[in-house]
Amino acid sequence: MEFPFDVDALFPERITVLDQHLRPPARRPGTTTPARVDLQQQIMTIVDELGKASAKAQHLPAPITSALRMQSNRHVIYVLKDTSARPAGKGAIIGFLKVGYKKLFVLDDREAHNEVEPLCILDFYIHESVQRHGHGRELFQYMLQKERVEPHQLAIDRPSPKLLKFLNKHYNLETTVPQVNNFVIFEGFFAHQHRSPTPSLRATRHSRAAVVDPIPAAPARKLPPKRAEGDIKPYSSSDREFLKVAVEPPWPLNRAPRRATPPAHPPPRSSSLGNSPDRGPLRPFVPEQELLRSLRLCPPHPTARLLLATDPGGSPAQRRRTRETPWGLVAQSCHYSRHGGFNTSFLGTGNQERKQGEQEAEDRSASEDQVLLQDGSGEEPTHTVAPRAQAPPAQSWMVGGDILNARVIRNLQERRNTRPW
């Protein structure tokens, strides 16, 4: 396989080993190249062209070897160049062999799963024009010596029929162990699995990895111990007791203290509920005297109102409680003043009963005036009514008035059965 640049100057040896960095090998003394030539770009071009030729020979839809894949994996390519002929003095590439370590789960002859990390043959290609000339065996044998591995210890990734014939012809690898993946292993693969890998192979691999990528391994992080999980039980009836909201009795019975005896052993709480506070009484504790006072001053029950509504007369206490404030109770309010009149707006809206009382008071005062005049003069009483101008109006009385007004108020209050003083 020919290239437009000088392959002989790029690869001084017949077999060149390339790692993931695709760097050109050390140059022989006396070899000169122009400074502008990008050697790494030439190596990437060679790898890409070899991958395309291998995919075409194996009838693969896409190449499995490329410069980009090489840079993202720790694989190794053994490149074989032709030193016999130098067309135009630039050299040519015969083929390549790509290998790498992979962690696999394979089955042994007893169909038991085994976790291994063998060296795998990932891609192998020799140009069609130089096949059957021993170039393939030369390249394969160089790889075995370099990696210090035996042919039966290898795992081959999707080998072609030509590769299987090649291994059978040169290394007597014929009997395979069936696997569930795309890798093929031969009989004798597990003969040395009970022993650790060859120290030289492992040391070579790790030393190569350290030189290629000298990055220290990250220290293992210790995870905290996992706490034991208890049984998660659903809510029981006892767990839900404290969540129940008590129904309050009708007023004023709800003002009475509810003395509930606390349980000796409270029900266990579920861990998912957290530390919820206990529900206290709905109302604070009310003393007995305050309870009796509230019962005495509380409004009547709707049932009692219904009974009083059906009774046309009702009880006297209820009538006194529900009817309007009489005149005599004005002295109990803040409207009373011994130096002036009281607020007449409180008496502005009278009813028929008030008018009736005023008329009776006027008649009685008139009769008393006649008795007093008869007692003072010794004459026969005359049924003459005092002029209205001499008697002050009933609604404009004052405590400092005459004796007649005081008597009228006294008689009126006795009739009302209430006393303001």
Curated annotation (Swiss-Prot):
UniProt-listed HAMAP family? mec17
What processing steps or modifications follow its translation?
Autoacetylation strongly increases tubulin acetylation.
Protein name, please? Alpha-tubulin N-acetyltransferase 1
Keywords, comma-separated and alphabetical: Acetylation, Acyltransferase, Cell junction, Cell projection, Coated pit, Cytoplasm, Cytoskeleton, Membrane, Methylation, Phosphoprotein, Transferase
List residues, modification Phosphoserine. Answer: S272, S276, S315
Q: What the protein does? A: Specifically acetylates 'Lys-40' in alpha-tubulin on the lumenal side of microtubules. Promotes microtubule destabilization and accelerates microtubule dynamics; this activity may be independent of acetylation activity. Acetylates alpha-tubulin with a slow enzymatic rate, due to a catalytic site that is not optimized for acetyl transfer. Enters the microtubule through each end and diffuses quickly throughout the lumen of microtubules.
| Region Disordered, annotated ranges | 214-235, 252-284, 342-398
Segments of skewed composition (Polar residues) = 342-351
Q: Does the keyword Cytoplasm apply?
A: yes
Post-translational modification N6-acetyllysine, affected residues: K56, K146, K233, K244
Q: Which reaction does it catalyse?
A: L-lysyl-[alpha-tubulin] + acetyl-CoA = N(6)-acetyl-L-lysyl-[alpha-tubulin] + CoA + H(+)
